Amino acid sequence: MATLDENNPSKQTHRHWSIENEIKLFSLLCDYKPAGKNKQHNIKIIINNINESLDSKEEPFSEYDVWNKLRSLYDLEKIDQIEELSTENTSTEETTNQVSSGSANITKDTKNAKTTLDAKEPIQDKKEMDKEKSESSSLSTPEPPQRRTRSARDTTKSKRNLRDTPKEKSQYNDEEITSGGAEKSKVEVSSTSDHTDDQSPTPGSTKKGLDEQTNDDMSDIEDVDKDKGDETIAKIKKENTSEQEEDKNKKQTEEEAEEEEEEGDHVSGDERESKNKDTSEDEDGEDNEDQDEDDVEVIEDSHTDKENESSSEESSPEPMTKRTRQRTRSTHEKTEHTSPNIKKRTRQSVKFDDKPAEPSDTGSRKRRAPPGSVSPPHPPKTRRRTRSVTHEIEEEDASTQSADDAEPEIIKVETRHTTRRSSRISMEPSSSTPNVRVRRSSRKR
């Protein structure tokens, strides 16, 4: 509240502002500026807002108090100048905006007019070109369009290159379309001429007719391009499928050839195994023959030794004939006549520990082929030695004579079963035969 000074009563003193009131003043200044044309109206609003927040005990603020406080803080004259300049600028901007909007409308109108003129010009140019082409085509015969032949390289293109084919074909398809377009233009020109004769030409009707013609031409061109593009794609697909089928057939033939080679290898391996088995069986048969021959030689050697001993006791010793591996029949007969009392021993006559002699089956020693072998078993190649009838008659006569003259000598000989490795027969001296010699065969294996 303003108070009068005692020394100078005409002057009013400044009112004291609290911090809360100053804060309210500053916040209101942000919304309502006390400058420019509306400064009085804004000051009233500020005063009313401040007085509403005061208590009933405090006096309300006057307009003078608010202006004094603002002058102490701000330079109000400069603020007024700035606000005036800003208002002038805003007014000029508004005027310029109005002018620019008017000019923009004018330019739009001019542009629209230009576009309409530009659209009319190409239509007229097209008309003239169509007329010239129709005249030239009527004078000269139309040449058939040359079709482009596809090379072998084009057929082997990948699927990625399929996108490029319609573009390439559209270039040389334009030539074909132009000839068709010329014929269409003839028909269109004739139809338009008929209409113009019947009806009076108007600018609106001419524009519509030209637009419809251009749209029809473009649609026809697009249809032709689509049809040809579909045909080319179908051809390329057929070629790709044929190539895939050829590749499959080649792979199948190669696989069949490989299978035949593998079967031939298996058959050759089986033949080799059968041959190896045959050779092993042949070797086993030869070994059995050798063993049989060795056994016979050992028995013959023992027989000749005993004959020599008996002959030395009865008569003077005779020179021994040199034994060879192959004995003739004459030597056997001589030995039999010189010693009639001694019983000739063979495989069947020799007694081993009072047991009947068991004939050795050479076929039992043969190796058995495995069950998986393919080749059939071969017959044994060993020769079985048979005794003639004359030898049996001579032995019976000798046995009857020896039974009358002297007691038969029974020699017990312990032998081992002949095996593949045994090349000798161990002979132990017994009481009945004190001097029994066993000689090793000189045959080399």
Curated annotation (Swiss-Prot):
Residues 87-97 have a biased composition (Low complexity). One of its GO terms (cellular component) is NuA4 histone acetyltransferase complex. InterPro entries: Eaf7/MRGBP (IPR012423). Residues 213-224, 255-264, 280-299, 393-408 have a biased composition (Acidic residues). GO terms for biological process: chromatin remodeling; DNA repair; regulation of transcription by RNA polymerase II. The keyword Transcription regulation applies. Residues 108-135, 151-172, 225-254, 265-279, 300-309 have a biased composition (Basic and acidic residues). Residues 98-107, 188-205 have a biased composition (Polar residues). It holds the Pfam family Eaf7. Residues 85-445 are annotated as: Disordered. Belongs to the EAF7 family. Component of the NuA4 histone acetyltransferase complex. This is Chromatin modification-related protein EAF7. The lineage of its organism: Eukaryota, Fungi, Dikarya, Ascomycota, Saccharomycotina. The gene is EAF7.
